[in-house]
Amino acid sequence: MNSRLWNLEKDYDTLVKWWNQHDFDLPVPKDVLPPLGIIIEEDNVSICAAGLYEDYKRTKFGFMFGLFTNPEIGKIKLYKAMNNCLQEIHKLAKVKELGLVYTITGENALFKLYEKNNMTLVENNTRSYVMNVQQENYNDLRWIMGNDIIETVNK
């Protein structure tokens, strides 16, 4: 398996394809994804990806956004690729001189993977909120909502 920095101009269509295959309500808008990210590939097939936000003022705090996966990949290969992706995010964070990388997940399947990669559970009962500063550009937030919230909004 190989890793590379993602290039949203090239890789965004792949991410959208994965999100559609996973039945996401909407794709994540390209302009809110971080310019930094990692793609794991094998034989020119993208397997998984994660984004890394960093503060342009060089704070020591980063945010890993997503661990997006190709649903056509088998579980064993996918697990290895996700593990590699986390290791590459760690390396990228070191290069960018970040001290901490924060992430959130509601996916039970990722808990053990994160812990195996020395990530520390810091909150177990959290609600996520977004302040929509540009409602004219982001009037539909289903791409960031959990299914339980989407169900209540659609009622």
Report residues per predicted region.
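Short amphipathic alpha-helix that is part of the acyltransferase structural core
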Residues: M1-V28, D140-K155
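Generic alpha-helical hydrophobic packing signal
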Residues: S3, S46, G62, E88, ...
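Solvent-exposed amphipathic alpha-helical surface segments
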Residues: H22, L26, L92, K96, ...
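A short helix-loop-beta-strand connector motif used in the catalytic cores of GNAT acetyltransferases and
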Residues: L26-C48
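A short beta-turn/loop motif at secondary-structure boundaries
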Residues: K30-V32, Y56, G106
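Conserved beta-strand in the GNAT
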Residues: I39, V45-D55, K60-G66
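Terminal substrate-recognition subdomain of acyl/acetyltransferases
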Residues: E42, K94, Y102-K155
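Acyl-donor binding region in acyl/amide transferases
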Residues: K60-N118, N124
